[in-house]
Amino acid sequence: MDAMEIERIADSLERYGDRFLRHVFTEGEVAYCRRKRDSASSFAARFAAKEAAMKALGTGFSRGVYWQGIEVVRHHGPPQLQFHGGALARFQALGATRSLLTLTHSRELSIAHVLLLRD
């Protein structure tokens, strides 16, 4: 689980702009969030999801796990995680076969819960 202050993300967006976006989010995540009326809330939820996923993987920013190696996607239905590179390797090394992601927002916070499961 992780929580992120929406205002903190809004400040980073204002201060660092595209440099912040390119460092943390995939192109797909940026496109999705920019379509939202409250994009800072959507970016904050994805930021929290990435941090919660790193906790679930037990790595933080190590063992080849980086921001863009964890992606929040939403095709149909609820958002899901996709792992890439070192994050995918760690996911597989743990014997995980799928992940569950929940996102929620309040006025101040975006909160993410991540579970890694073995079938």
Predicted regions and their residues:
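Core catalytic alpha/beta fold that binds nucleotide/phospho-ligands
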Residues: 1-119
